[in-house]
Amino acid sequence: MAILDICTYPDPILRQKAASVENIDEALIKLIDDMTETMYEAPGIGLAANQVGRSLSLIVVDLQRQDEEHGLIVLINPQIVATQGEITWEEGCLSVPEYFSAVKRHAEVVVRGYGRDGKEMEIQAGGLLAVALQHEIDHLEGRLFIDRLNPITRDIFKRKWKKKLKEATA
């Protein structure tokens, strides 16, 4: 296994819609393992393939550090098939380091996809797991959590981010 580089905003791959995974082979299993190791090392609770430079519909999520009930979830070609309610949660992102903001999402979701073994699976989630799944699936659509901020907060973020990038290159 290997630690992969995490792409950060404004890397263009973060704005691309991920390609559907057509088959599960050794290369995909290695990517899953590498993404999982990268997520743990970061540390994070979720990671989408495009965050590590691969335009594939693949996510890994593990809330075990936050919630003993859930372990590692690997989802290939995940889709949200049902939603209910609304929740606001303080979110951050490995691709937008050191920035956190409250984001409105669905309180409950049902997600379908395939596991690393190729078997179809369905996950019913609420709370942090629902938020994490929606956040990672957004990545696969080329969306970042900052896109869900209200216009004023998003504008403040963009100004702060430009200043941060300018300082980093000075």
From Swiss-Prot:
Record key words, sorted? Hydrolase, Iron, Metal-binding, Protein biosynthesis
**Gene Ontology MF terms:** metal ion binding; peptide deformylase activity
What is the enzyme's class at the highest EC level?
hydrolase
Cofactor(s) needed: Fe(2+)
Q: Where does Fe cation bind?
A: 93, 135, 139
Give me the reactions it catalyses: N-terminal N-formyl-L-methionyl-[peptide] + H2O = N-terminal L-methionyl-[peptide] + formate
The keyword Hydrolase is annotated on this UniProt entry: yes
EC? 3.5.1.88
A Pfam family that the UniProt record links to this protein: Pep_deformylase
The active site consists of 136
Cofactor binding remark:
Binds 1 Fe(2+) ion.
Q: Name one GO biological process term.
A: co-translational protein modification
Supply the InterPro entries for this chain: Peptide_deformylase (IPR023635), Peptide_deformylase_sf (IPR036821)
Extract the PANTHER family matched here: PEPTIDE DEFORMYLASE
- What family does the Swiss-Prot or TrEMBL record give for this protein? Belongs to the polypeptide deformylase family.
Please describe what this protein does. Answer: Removes the formyl group from the N-terminal Met of newly synthesized proteins. Requires at least a dipeptide for an efficient rate of reaction. N-terminal L-methionine is a prerequisite for activity but the enzyme has broad specificity at other positions.
Family annotation (HAMAP family): Pep_deformylase (MF_00163)
Q: What is this protein called?
A: Peptide deformylase
